[in-house]
Design a protein with these regions (language model features):
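A short beta-strand element within the Helicase C-terminal
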Residues: 318, 325-340, 366-369
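Inter-Walker segment of RecA-like/P-loop motor cores
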Residues: 98-138
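Post-DEXD/H (motif II) to motif III coupling segment of the RecA-like Helicase ATP-binding lobe
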Residues: 152-153, 158-223, 388
Length: 414
């Protein structure tokens, strides 16, 4: 039906698992919840009444949704299944659980394509759950994970990405407590209402700008820089069909010149170059001599690149869509978007969100979007920005040459 589901029938009691957030396994206190994180946990729990226990918490990237999940686990005090977007996010959850709760390693297990262990707290991915056996029975063999333990809580990380097959199995889990975590409930397929109907109503939502004003997330400056097509590419664009028009504009080779200029400006910063098209990103990676991280990158290499970036040994990282979701890169302060998934508002928000963890000395994060002027690329860019402009963000619009000239004047006055 698509109506928010408020479960008042009560919940199945899962197997107990006392958890203390903020304490190490030897009882040392290390962390405490921020005021808004505590409020989010209490809004979900509702004092343990039937009005709590299922719903969605919406917080910006960098505001500590994982920590809110752990705070809810402490309140529920039962065995928990956590579903994430990919193996990197899965291992980040495990690392955070072991660092910020009193759970020991033997209590937190990974269930993925590489390792299939089940424990009192099990972290898995949507990908392994939706793996299909060709011609086999059952169709989704890993759905049995939902019944392997008497889970008292299921956490859906990045719940706006919930795949359709998981929608179906979630409909059979209404007797269990369910927590959805997300930075934006925008779905480009228009199925936001199904998230509410299956997980529960929105329990807590904090505006991005409010957290920025309270210094919980970094201030962000957003720029759209418009680049022209060459005369040859303009001719090719004019005769192309609609889908090819976008690709021609989005992969405009002239974006490389402005990209190099921005990188020179931010040579001392940690920079992400983010795009949609692999051939474009491969060319940029080769031109810059910077590593490319994409869907084909093995998990071990992926984690090594993330680690090098976090430690400052790697200043520039070229990334595909794999970096859109649930990737913890706290030191990234600049993102340069060279192409995106058409008019995806959710993707734009997630990409800006990679930068929002508070910076040393209160420095601003800077987000650049490189767009080909008077094309489908510019048209889709305006759609992509809608969610962030509704949150109070403003984009400064530049023609490429004007940006270079203004930047040169600024550098000369330093």
């Amino acid at each position: 039906m698509g109506y928010p589901c408020e479960d008042l029938a009560g919940y199945k009691a899962g197997d107990p698992l006392p958890i203390r957030f903020g304490y190490t396994s030897n009882g040392e206190r290390k962390y405490s919840l921020r005021p808004y994180q505590k409020a989010a946990c209490e809004a979900f729990w509702a004092g343990g009444s039937a009005r709590g226990g299922s719903g969605v918490i919406v917080l910006p990237c960098g505001a500590g949704k994982t920590i809110v999940g752990m705070g809810v686990m402490e309140k529920v005090g039962m065995q928990t299944l956590i579903l994430t977007t990919n193996v990197v996010a899965l291992r980040q959850w495990i690392s955070e659980l072991l660092d910020k709760t009193d759970l020991s390693p033997d209590m937190v297990k990974e269930y993925s394509g590489e390792c299939k262990e089940i424990g009192p707290v099990t972290v898995s991915t949507y990908q392994i759950l939706t793996y299909r056996k060709r011609g086999g029975k059952p169709e989704y063999p890993h759905f049995e994970l939902f019944d392997k333990r008497n889970w008292g809580l299921i956490i859906y990380d990045e719940v706006h990405l919930l795949p359709a097959p998981v929608f179906r199995i979630t409909a059979d889990l209404q007797a269990r407590r369910r927590l959805g975590l997300t930075a934006t409930l925008v779905r480009e397929d228009g199925r936001e209402d199904e998230v509410f109907s299956l997980i529960g109503p929105k329990k807590f939502d904090k505006p991005w700008k409010e957290l920025e004003e309270q210094n919980w997330i970094a201030q962000a400056l957003c720029h759209e820089i418009r680049v022209d097509l060459s005369s040859e590419d303009r001719l090719e664009y004019a005769v192309a069909d609609e889908r090819d028009k976008y690709r021609i504009a989005a992969t405009n080779p002239r974006k490389l010149e402005i990209l190099k200029h921005i990188l020179k400006r931010h040579q001392d910063d940690q920079v992400l170059v983010i795009g949609q098209y692999l051939d474009q990103l491969e060319g940029i990676s080769t031109e810059l001599g910077a590593p490319l991280l994409c869907g084909q990158t093995p998990n071990a290499e992926r984690e090594a690149l993330y680690q090098a970036f976090k430690e400052g040994r790697l200043k520039t990282l070229v990334v595909s869509k794999v970096a859109n979701f649930a990737v913890d890169l706290p030191d990234a302060s600049v993102a340069i978007q060279v192409s995106g998934t058409f008019g995806s508002r959710q993707e734009e928000a997630q990409r800006l969100g990679r930068l929002l963890r508070p910076k040393p000395q209160g420095d601003c994060a800077v987000f650049y979007s490189l767009v080909t002027r008077n094309t489908k690329d510019q048209e889709f860019s305006q759609k992509r920005q809608l969610f962030l402009t509704e949150q109070g963000y403003k984009y400064t619009i530049w023609e490429a040459q004007h940006f270079i000239e203004a930047d040169a004047r600024e550098m000369n006055t330093r």
